[in-house]
Amino acid sequence: MSSVYITEPPTRGKLLVHTSFGDLDVELWPNEAPLACRNFVQHCVDGTYDGTVFHRVVKDFMLQGGDPTGTGSGGESIWTKPFKDEIHTRLRFNHRGLLAMANGNQRDSNMSQFFFTLAPCEWLKGKHTIFGKVTGNTIFNLLTVSSLETNPETDRPLDPPTLK
């Protein structure tokens, strides 16, 4: 087994994320990132993400969603204010399929937006809260979005995939 995965703590929760490009099996780290997990799961349960678009795709980097306005500048946390980053030393951006909070490059500014990694992104270490990962063969559903045609100025897909 790869040492990449040996360093990760065990996951303690699972959910199925329905998207227009296929389902994603996601396992969560609620012990390491309790605020991010609670926020994400509650938004899923409340239907906040239903029908929203993945507004940003960067080839071989990431897929971003979770903004109810679809613009990349909206959304709020379940507490209606930003919440703190939860950086854990055993959770690193060293493989594809990680689920993390998007924060506009400002510390402790997490709201509703999140992203999935499409490749290792070590330069993000200590900058974003990792709180889950895509598991099993559903990782291949996620990887199909890397080749979507996007607006080169905004990274917005010309035909944005959606959360269901």
Segments from the language model and where they lie:
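Cyclophilin-like peptidyl-prolyl cis-trans isomerases
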Residues: 1-164
